[in-house]
Regions:
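A short, Lys/Arg-rich alpha-helix, primarily the initiator
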Residues: 1-25
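Short, charged recognition helix plus adjacent turn
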Residues: 71-103
Length: 103
């Protein structure tokens, strides 16, 4: 597993900087295109809401890319966050391979 100290680009940063800014659209316009509330888009853009499969499908359709693009972006961030959380890593360190656990 490759560990990096640098956090991957967040979903919100990607939506805002790589899509909304170049397309010159605001959160309200994106919300309308997606068929969701402006609050939902705001929460995505500010990192308060994670990408779900449904959201990935909507963003892919709106921006002309794939759902996997959005899901992979979310997954990379989730994994980075877990690997850089001492509390979560301490819990993972207690996990034993199944052969050891049953011996």
């Amino acid at each position: 597993m490759i560990l990096t100290k640098r956090q991957p680009v967040s979903v919100g940063e990607m939506i805002t900087e790589e899509f909304m800014v170049p397309l010159e659209i605001n959160q309200g316009q994106l919300a309308s295109a997606m068929g969701v509330s402006r609050r939902t888009v705001n929460e995505l853009c500010t990192g308060k809401r994670s990408i779900t499969v449904d959201t990935a499908l909507m963003l892919a359709k709106v921006f002309g890319n794939t759902p996997n693009f959005w899901l992979n972006l979310q997954q990379r961030n989730d994994l980075w966050t877990a690997l850089h959380s001492p509390k979560r890593m301490k819990k993972i360190e207690r996990v034993r391979p199944i052969r050891e656990a049953t011996a």
